[in-house]
Structure formats: C-alpha cells, structure tokens
Amino acid sequence: MLNTTFDQYLEFPCSFPFKVVGDASETLADRVVAVVQQHAPGDYSPTSKVSSKGTYLSVTIRVTVTSKDHIETLYTSLAAIEGVKRVL
C-alpha cells in the first residue's frame, strides 16, 4: 500500500475528492465511475474539464471513503486506468 497519513487528518467515513487527469477521451469519465463503483457503489456525477489544447481531460469525483486503505485502494485503481496520467 501507499505510505500516506490520511488517517491522521480525516475522520471516516467522509466525502473525499479524486481528480483523475488523462488523455482526452469521451469514455474517461465512464471508466472512472466504473472503477469507483467497484470499490464504493453509489450514484456519482463526476465533473470534467478539457485542457486548453484539448490534449487532456480531468475528471473530478467525490467518493464517500471509509478508511485510509480505502483511499489508497481507490488511488491505485484509478491510476491503473488506461490513459490516466495522474490521480490527485
């Protein structure tokens, strides 16, 4: 797992924002939601924004997380999506 200190600063469960930046693709937001659904089923409405040159797309999604491990698992799973460059 990742070596994070989320448990020192957050009280669980809580709403946690994830921003996924990847190659511009019409399906990126759907793929992000599909991965989140595997780890935290729910009804999600992500927001997305295309970069100024149209090369990248950022998808922001808020997820109710239950632990530090839950956050780390989501970071790792989201980063594994094809075309994803960063997860913030």
Swiss-Prot record:
| Gene Ontology, cellular component aspect | cytosol
Q: What is this protein called?
A: UPF0250 protein Sama_2593
SUPFAM superfamilies registered for this protein in UniProt: YbeD/HP0495-like
Record NCBIfam families: PRK04998.1
Q: Which organism is it from?
A: Shewanella amazonensis (strain ATCC BAA-1098 / SB2B)
InterPro entries per the UniProt record, alphabetical: UPF0250_YbeD-like, YbeD-like_sf
- Give the family per the record: Belongs to the UPF0250 family.
